[in-house]
A protein has these predicted regions:
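C-terminal alpha-helical cap of glycosyltransferases
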Residues: 153-172
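Short hydrophobic beta-strand element within catalytic cores of glycosyltransferases
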Residues: 72, 88-99
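Short alpha-helical segment that forms part of, or immediately flanks, the ligand-binding pocket
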Residues: 61, 79-87, 107
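Two-component system phosphotransfer/interaction surface
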Residues: 123-136, 165
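Donor-nucleotide binding loops and adjacent catalytic segments primarily
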Residues: 1-72, 102-106, 111, 116-127
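A short, well-ordered alpha-helix in the C-terminal region of glycosyltransferases
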Residues: 140-154
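Acidic donor-binding loop of glycosyltransferase active sites
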Residues: 65-79, 87-88
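Short histidine/acidic/glycine/proline-rich micro-motifs that form metal-
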Residues: 5-7, 36, 94-97, 149-150
Length: 172
């Protein structure tokens, strides 16, 4: 569960309310809370040996590699990382993002059957059941995983550098 570098009140509140469900099904959770809610989330997870709580995960690639399902906001950087990782994803876009770009990002993947979208408004009721359902549906996880990989642009950094150099006079 990743709510971006600052965390997500919505995702944190959903998870705090759903810890028992994950424990019952023996599901391990890696939870990045952000700094603002870290103490409250850490306290809520006390006694849940299946839940590892971090304010920030520096080596997010390791957390992604360990995950069977990823729950995330839908910012551009997160989306690009998730496409490269190729894991099944549930996206809960931040509704106050400029021009609602996170919802647009999420819907591009949803339309390609590459992610599941849950609105921030409905996350409290829908997120935990959707995560549990996806964790228990290997076929759906495989489909989402295969489809999200098609959105990955592995040489994005090189493409950006090439475009920048085109703008600099005298640089080929």
């Amino acid at each position: 569960i990743v709510g971006g570098s600052l965390g997500s009140r919505t995702l944190n509140n959903c998870l705090m309310g759903g810890l028992d469900y994950f424990k019952e099904q023996k599901i391990q959770v890696i939870w990045q809370t952000g700094t603002l809610m870290f103490d409250a989330c850490k306290q809520a997870a006390k006694g849940y040996d299946n839940v590892k709580v971090f304010d920030f995960i520096s080596n997010i690639d390791h957390a992604y590699a360990a995950a069977d399902v990823i729950v995330s906001r839908a910012g551009a950087i997160a989306i690009s990382e998730l496409c490269l990782v190729g894991k099944p994803v549930i996206l809960v876009p931040f509704p106050a993002a400029a021009e609602d770009h996170q919802t647009k990002n999420a819907m591009a993947l949803v339309e390609g059957n590459a992610a599941i979208h849950i609105s921030d408004k409905h996350a409290q009721e829908q997120l935990i059941p959707a995560a549990l359902q996806l964790l228990n549906d290997e076929n759906k996880r495989t489909t989402l995983s295969n489809n999200i990989k098609a959105f990955a642009i592995e040489d994005a950094a090189e493409r950006i550098v090439d475009e920048v150099f085109k703008l600099i006079p005298g640089v080929n």
